[in-house]
């Protein structure tokens, strides 16, 4: 929500959300838009006092800033907000793929897409280092102004991806790969799955806990257009949680059941199940998006 103050406009809820993701823990945060040495966005989504106040020493993400000179480090008269993200002794960022000079929207978008498409999708058995990521992306496509982009942080560092995969095996007794039915409000759902390594081998020695989250379908939203001269922007979000639970993993296998709530989105579409699992020494992640949800069960049992 836009808040007008004497000097300018602010979005305090957006800043609060940013701080929430910092404190709760995120693997990486990506920002594309206006910015400068003292912060992000004209409305100061992020500024020097905010960065200085972070205390997330155990939850530091990688920060990608497709913006202008956020991390300029050669001005002796001031310390940029990007530098403070690294220098904050109580928290901040584990590293930044960022800018030190004014850049244009075109090269910003190109480099941003290259980082995601070529490296951060983790499509190989070897997780690339931050130095490998940035070197490869800057050398692809003849990027204009590539010297304005830099890496702040340890180039030998790799992101802390979960080591193993969580796989969905069956839904209501039917193999997940063959399940083509739809599920509606008040339906009972039983899901089984297992943990495997990156080579696809079942991990029968994995004993721990799995945390499944079942999301409803994506919905399209539109921005508030607080600036009447701006072009309205549509975007997709998946915020509605239908089930969130804790499941025991025994010998690499897990099983859980739940009822779909009454207040789902009744249109038909693909939901998504996100997984995280861990034990005392290892962790795993995964997702499943082959589950169609919509409508309701007319024969549901009464409470």
Over which residues does each language-model region extend?
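Short glycine/proline/serine/threonine-rich loop/turn segments at secondary-structure transition edges
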Residues: 262-272
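Cysteine-dependent hydrolase recognition
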Residues: 1-246, 250-259, 269, 277, ...
């Amino acid at each position: 929500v836009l808040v007008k103050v004497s000097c300018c406009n602010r979005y305090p809820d957006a800043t609060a959300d940013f701080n929430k993701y910092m404190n709760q823990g995120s693997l990486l945060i990506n920002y594309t838009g206006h910015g400068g040495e003292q912060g992000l966005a004209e409305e100061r989504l992020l500024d020097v006092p905010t960065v200085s106040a972070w205390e997330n020493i155990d939850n530091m993400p990688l920060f990608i800033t497709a913006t202008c000179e956020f991390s300029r480090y050669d001005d002796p008269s001031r310390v940029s907000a990007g530098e403070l993200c690294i220098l904050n002794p109580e928290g901040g960022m584990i590293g930044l793929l960022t800018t030190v000079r004014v850049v244009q929207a075109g090269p910003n978008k190109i480099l941003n897409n290259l980082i995601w498409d070529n490296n951060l999708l983790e499509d190989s058995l070897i997780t690339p280092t931050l130095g490998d990521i940035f070197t490869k992306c800057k050398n692809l496509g003849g990027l204009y102004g590539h010297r304005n982009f830099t890496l702040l942080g340890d180039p030998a560092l790799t992101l802390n991806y979960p080591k193993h995969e969580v796989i969905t095996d069956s839904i209501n007794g039917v193999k997940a790969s063959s399940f083509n039915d739809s599920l509606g409000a008040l339906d009972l759902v039983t899901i089984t799955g297992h943990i495997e390594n990156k080579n696809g081998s079942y991990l029968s020695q994995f004993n721990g806990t799995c945390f499944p989250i079942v999301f409803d379908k994506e919905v399209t939203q539109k921005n508030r257009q607080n600036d009447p001269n701006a072009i309205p922007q549509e975007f997709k979000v998946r915020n509605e949680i239908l089930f969130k639970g804790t499941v025991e993993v025994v010998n690499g296998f897990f099983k859980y059941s739940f009822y779909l709530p009454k207040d789902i989105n009744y249109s038909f579409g693909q939901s998504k199940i996100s997984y995280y699992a861990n034990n005392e020494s290892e962790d795993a992640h995964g997702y499943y998006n082959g589950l169609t949800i919509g409508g309701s069960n007319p024969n549901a049992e009464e409470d």
